[in-house]
Every structure is written in C-alpha cells, then in structure tokens.
Amino acid sequence: MTTTSAFMLNVRLDNVAVVAIDVPGEKVNTLKAEFAAQVRAILKQIRENKALQGVVFISAKADNFIAGADINMIGHCQNAQEAETLARQGQQLMAEIQALPVPVIAAIHGACLGGGLEMALACHRRICTDDVKTVLGLPEVQLGLLPGSGGTQRLPRLVGVSTALDMILTGKQLRARQALKAGLVDDVVPQTILLEAAVELAKKERLAQRTLPVRERILAGPLGRALLFRLVRKKTAQKTQGNYPATERIIDVIETGLAQGSSSGYDAEARAFGELAMTPQSQALRAVFFASTEVKKDPGSDAPPGPLNSVGILGGGLMGGGIAWVTACKGGLPVRIKDINTQGINHALKYSWDLLETKVRRRHIKANERDKQLALISGSTDYRGFSHRDLVIEAVFEDLPLKQQMVAEVEQNCAAHTIFASNTSSLPIGDIAANAARPEQVIGLHFFSPVEKMPLVEVIPHASTSAQTIATTVKLAKKQGKTPIVVSDKAGFYVNRILAPYINKAIRMLTEGERVEHIDAALVKFGFPVGPIQLLDEVGIDTGTKIIPVLEAAYGERFSAPANVVASILNDDRKGRKNGRGFYLYGEKGRKSKKQVDPAIYKLIGVQGQSRLSAQQVAERCVMLMLNEAARCFDEKVIRSARDGDIGAVFGIGFPPFLGGPFRYMDALGPGEMVATLQRLAALYGPRYAPCEQLVRMAERREHFWTNGETDQGN
C-alpha cells in the first residue's frame, strides 16, 4: 500500500488483521469511490492469508469512525444511471467485506454515519465506545436520498423493521447505549480498550444472528408487516406533505427487501438511489448542506480574531439563560452573568441545570460532566468578575437608552479590548454604539429563541465595527455551535425583515375571513415546519409583532399590519403559548390542545372565519412577499451573498429545505416568472406585491442569484 492510502493493513502477532482508516489530509474520514481499489487489495490479502483469525476495522482519527460517503461523488453523476452504478459499486464492496471467511469487527469511536454505518453493518459484529462523540445513524434522507450501499437491507434484519424504519426515515442518530439496546452494536467499552476488545471479539467464532425482540418478530411477519407499513406510510405522508420523495422510496425499498428477499431489495435500493439523486429536492438539500458547511468555515472577516477565553452576559432572562448555556456547555467557555437581582441569576443557572439534567436522565452525559459544565457559569448583581471578559453579550430589554447605558458600563468595568455584543432583534447597532468610547468594539449578535435549539445567529457590524471584532464574534458563535451569517445594520436585519411581511400577510388574510387552521395548513403543505399563525403563538404574539412598527418606520407602508387586530389580540392578554392564550387553545403547561383554534379569536377580530382561498393561493400570497423582500435584501447588501440568504432563511425561520432557500427557489422559478407572479398579485391585492427593482433587472437580463459557477458541489 502507498503512504497516501486511506486504508492500511497491519497483521498483529496474534494473527488478527487491523485495518486502520485514515483519509489523508482530512479531519474526518469519508468514503470516496477511489478508495474501492485500496479496500479490495486489502480484502484480497486477507482472503489469501489462511492463518488469520479475524479482522478489525478501526479509525485512526481521534474522534470519528467514518462520517459518511463523500457527497461530491453524487454531484459528479450526470444521470440516474450513473448514480445507480455508484450505489451498486458500494453494495458490491460491502458484500465482499461481509463474505470474508473470518470474523470481521467494526471498532467504532466517534461519528459512524451514512456509508460509515453501512460498512459497519457489513461487518459481522460491531463494538463502540461509550464516548459522547460516538453516534451511529443513516442520515441520507436529510439529503433527499436513501442509504445506497446496503443499509436499507441490512439494518432491518439486524435491529428489526420498525427500529430501522424510524432510523432511516428520520436520519436519527443513536448514542452508544441506545445502539446497544437496539442491537445495532454488540458491546460498549471505554475508548482506551476499544481495539483490544475488538480483537478479542474477532478471535471468537462467528456467533449466531441475534434474536429480535418479540415485537419486531411479529412486525416482520406478513400480517404485522402489512399493518406496520400502512401506518408508517400514513404517518410519513402527514409529516412530509408529499414534499420529500425519498421517504416514500425508503419505505418501498425496505418493504421490497422483506417481502421479496434481499437480492430484490438491493436492486430496488440502487435503482431508487439513482433516481432520487437526480430529483430537484435532493439537489436542493445537498446545496443547503454544502452552503452550511461553507458558512461554518467563513471567518467573517480577513482580520485574525482577538482573544476569546471568557464571556460575560448581561441579563439572566430567557435569552440570557440560553446564551449562557450554549457558551458554557457547547463552547466550553467560562461565563459570568450579571442581573439586577439574584432571581435573574438563579433563573439563568436553573435554565442550564434543567437542560443538563435532562441529558443526565437520558444518559447522554454523566452527573460529573453536568457538574463540570455547570461550574463554568457564575453570576453577580454587579460587575465583579467582569474585568477580564473578552466579550460581553447584552440580553436586556429592547430599550435603546438602557442598551446605551450597558455599553458605557461595560467600557467602564471591563478590559480595553472587551467586545460589546448586543442581542437586539430590532434596534440599530449604530444607535446602540452612538455614545461608545470604543464603537469599533460594538457589534450585534442576534440569537433566535429557543437559543439551545435554533442553529442560526446573525452577526451585525455597524459602520465603525472593526474587522477583528467581526472575526472574534463569528468565532464565538461557532464555538457555541451556531451557524453565523454576517448581515448589515439595517432595520430588522435579515431574518426578521423577510419574516415580517410573511406573517403580516397571514394576519391580513385572517381579517379577510380565512380560518387560522387553513392558513397554517397551507404553509405547512408548502413546506414550512409550522404555519405563520402558529409561529406567532410560539415566539409570542407580543414579541413577534413588536418589530412591525420599527420596520414600517424604516421601509414604509408595505410593512404595516392591521393595527386594530393586533391591538385587540394583545389587549385580550393573548401572548401565545407562553401565557396559554393565543390563536390556539392550550392545556396545562402551555401545551396546544390537539391543534384546536380558539373559536373566540374570530369574534375578537370581527370576522366569521370562512375560508375562500385554496391552499396554493394562501401559500403564494405569503411566500411571494417573503421572496420579494429577500431580493431587496440582496440588492441592498443586507446579506453578503445568496448563500447567506438561503442559510439564514432555512436555519432561521424554517424555509423549506427541499427548495434550497429563497434564492435557489427564485432561481428555480426564474426571475421572469417571479416578476410576472408578483405583478399579477399586485393587480389583485395592491402595491405591496410590486416586484422590487432587483427582480425586474434580473428578469430583463435573464440573471440568477446563484451564478453558473456556483453548483451544489462542495469546494
């Protein structure tokens, strides 16, 4: 083997072959088509060595086994036949591993995903570490694909059909103990003894196939299987609304393998993989994947980041508590919280305790790890412990004089290099920095709620913010596990600016008599995770509508909402889920009562609630305003690129990923079609639908947001 080989064979003195996986020059192992020849050469040596007792596949990387196949291979395929051939080649290689005459063990530490898990499934036994980094799964569905190297056939036979369907249809990743319970791995051991434990397992005679639990055996029978697949199809259709063809094909392929045998199953798998690879949904989902990967690598500016060893947070409320958790528990940085009273500090500490305790209860971390992470967070009602903080995040009320006061206090009580980052959602960063002694160290860092779940943050420099401040803030966001996009300091920034007209239109249609559930269902069918009215309930009606006057003052009438309707709802003390009173009915602890709309809402706003528009018309009226505003943001350089605009919308508001984001969707529709549709809607519903200048210019020049050089390939 050459020194650049990703697979290296070493035969130990006890006649166990260890195949180390180490893709040269890469942080993580991914499978590439060109590795097939290397693996086959090793398999040939193994078959020819009659003295071998067993084989162990193990990664030489510090924290991953195999993170999956290289997705770029799919983009190089010109048609479905080429993609199908790629899948068949993978299937053949896995079959050769499975056919080895001696026990073959996969020794897994770190991520074992996609093609990595398919390789592990082809081994005769699997053993993994109890490390928090160890996860096993088949996430191909998230790219609009299915496992193409035998995963749809081997997994159901190993863990049972219902468990396999759940894993493959959702892309769910199992931790070590979950994998052991499911029968996906045979043992869980400390990382220090992984290799030796795998070697000992390899020396044993090949054991009989694990017996499936009674429930799985019943579901594997003809009657149980028929019932299961009928229920799974129904549930999946409700969830995907028909927008993700991969899910239906996954069900078909697994059912084919169980009903007609694995040979037919492998054939169906390869064929489905090839066809799915060519779908616009898969192409869009892969584009989102590559774009998010690029954004995570983007340093934000050309300047090197400044020191980032500890962080301060002003305000221990919902946002402050969430920011403290991601900073300490995700980023590993010491955090000092300041609040005006001890209750605020205790709230923030309890926020982190509750999240960590849930992880302990689910056995994701141990109690000592919880205590270690919690020890990173401390608090005070004054600025003691703030003098050495490298960056301070402000998460207080949306009040400009208060935030300006916070800037002055931080400049007085912290180091000369300390960055002040405001979590404002609506106030201009330039105004917050107006009286600052060091305005170059003031920046916006806009988190979305709930902080621990929402992946996006907006980094907002104002005109005087230094390049180093931008780079340091972007670095912090990445340490917090966030995907940061740098946006301009204009009213609403990017995400809230494109979201506001979308929600405004939903409220206007409500005043026209459309029913709440009809509006929400139409946008869910379009592809959003929740409808606009439900979203307003989730974020808080008071919070969600607070930015509307700011946007209307900045951009004019197109951002106006039916003020009397919003006032009526707020005056009736309806804030949404958080106080159990909103557009929907809520039971105990703010839980929605089976998606039932509160009928009193119609009387409150003075309408009957009789839907007249089709779902397509409802979706078009909401989405077109969002797209038009996104194009304006592109024109005004609120966002730096179409890439950032797509990621911001997908990660920030749940824009349908299978459409690739607003800019890829507009490119797919074509600028001419966009302009024609907006002009038609403007004639029907008024000038707020008038196409922006950017779209008109692009239609005239036949341009696109994503240039021809920008494909769905990773760089």
UniProtKB/Swiss-Prot annotation:
The protein's matches in InterPro entries, at most eight in alphabetical order, are given as: 3-OHacyl-CoA_DH_CS (IPR006180), 3-OHacyl-CoA_DH_NAD-bd (IPR006176), 3HC_DH_C (IPR006108), 6-PGluconate_DH-like_C_sf (IPR008927), ClpP/crotonase-like_dom_sf (IPR029045), Enoyl-CoA_hydra/iso (IPR001753), FA_oxidation_alpha_subunit (IPR050136), FadJ (IPR012802)
Name the source's superkingdom. Bacteria
Q: Name one GO molecular function term.
A: NAD+ binding
**Site residues, Important for catalytic activity:** E118, E140
Locate the transmembrane regions by residue number: none
**Annotated coiled-coil segments of the chain:** none
Q: Where is this region: 3-hydroxyacyl-CoA dehydrogenase?
A: 306-715
Reactions catalysed = a (3S)-3-hydroxyacyl-CoA = a (2E)-enoyl-CoA + H2O; a 4-saturated-(3S)-3-hydroxyacyl-CoA = a (3E)-enoyl-CoA + H2O; a (3S)-3-hydroxyacyl-CoA + NAD(+) = a 3-oxoacyl-CoA + NADH + H(+); (3S)-3-hydroxybutanoyl-CoA = (3R)-3-hydroxybutanoyl-CoA
Keyword terms: Cytoplasm, Fatty acid metabolism, Isomerase, Lipid degradation, Lipid metabolism, Lyase, Multifunctional enzyme, NAD, Oxidoreductase
The UniProt subunit note reads as follows:
Heterotetramer of two alpha chains (FadJ) and two beta chains (FadI).
Purpose: Catalyzes the formation of a hydroxyacyl-CoA by addition of water on enoyl-CoA. Also exhibits 3-hydroxyacyl-CoA epimerase and 3-hydroxyacyl-CoA dehydrogenase activities.
Name of the protein in question: Fatty acid oxidation complex subunit alpha
